[in-house]
């Protein structure tokens, strides 16, 4: 019986190890330092319903910030809406659920045509993260690494593939924690903000259109009203780091 218990425990450990594998860290080369505490507001537009996205844009206009929006081929806003909001940093959200790389590249081209230029940063669903080797020929940077379910990193890092990885903080993890108008969530975020201030960290805040309407707005407004941070788009941060560190990597498929 004890041996059966051992086999069961060993099997569970193997499954957990497989689930917890952070494949992006396999390509870690070095941490990229920033010159000042920096914040990026990013959104996964998994629901291209324009009134919901307008709420996000209106709030950012109120505070004078531009964000980075990752667009999916399966659900994106109209060409008219994209043109009217051309100051937004539009990038590509890949869907590897049931799709191989050739289909993902095809969808990337659809989004590139929609926004009128080539997207250079990719983010993939947490449900199905690709090996970075699959996307390195088409992007200069990735932002799929999730700071809540993996080792929390306050700074981007360069991979040995040449791509930059931008770890993000998703609001979706707090759906079941949201109590008392989010005061419990804010306590956690305050600790993160203090750490980022002290270390010239990079905070990439991720919100989605649907929860934004209910409580995601409060989370983003909490971040945007914090002092001591330079707010940039992810593309701006990427270009700054590539210049600072003289990163010459150019994807073959761009």
Where are these regions (language model features)?
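Catalytic alpha-helical scaffold of carbohydrate-active enzymes acting on polysaccharides/glycoconjugates
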Residues: 1-164, 184-205, 212-254
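Positively charged, amphipathic and often flexible ligand-engagement surfaces
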Residues: 165-180
């Amino acid at each position: 019986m004890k041996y059966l218990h051992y086999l069961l425990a060993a099997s569970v450990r193997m499954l957990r190890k497989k689930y917890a594998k952070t494949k992006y860290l396999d390509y870690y080369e070095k941490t990229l330092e920033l010159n000042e505490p920096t914040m990026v507001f990013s959104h996964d537009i998994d629901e291209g319903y324009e009134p919901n996205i307008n709420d996000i844009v209106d709030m950012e206009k109120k505070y004078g910030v531009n964000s980075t929006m990752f667009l999916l081929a399966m659900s994106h806003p109209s060409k008219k809406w994209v043109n009217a909001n051309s100051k937004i940093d539009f990038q590509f959200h890949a869907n590897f659920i049931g799709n191989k790389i050739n289909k993902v590249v095809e969808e990337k081209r659809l989004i590139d045509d929609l926004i009128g230029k080539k997207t250079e940063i990719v983010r993939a669903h947490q449900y199905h993260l690709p090996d970075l080797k699959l996307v390195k020929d088409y992007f200069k940077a990735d932002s799929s690494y999730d700071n809540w379910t993996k080792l929390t990193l306050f700074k981007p890092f360069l991979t040995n593939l040449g791509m930059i990885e931008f770890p993000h903080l998703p609001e979706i993890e707090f759906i079941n924690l949201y109590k008392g108008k989010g005061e419990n969530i804010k306590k956690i975020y305050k600790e993160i903000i203090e750490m980022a201030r002290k270390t010239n960290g990079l905070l990439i805040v991720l919100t989605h259109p649907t929860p934004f309407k209910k409580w995601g707005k409060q989370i983003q407004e909490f971040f945007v009203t914090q002092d001591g941070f330079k707010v940039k788009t992810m593309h701006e941060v990427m270009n700054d780091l590539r210049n600072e560190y003289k990163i010459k990597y150019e994807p073959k498929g761009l």
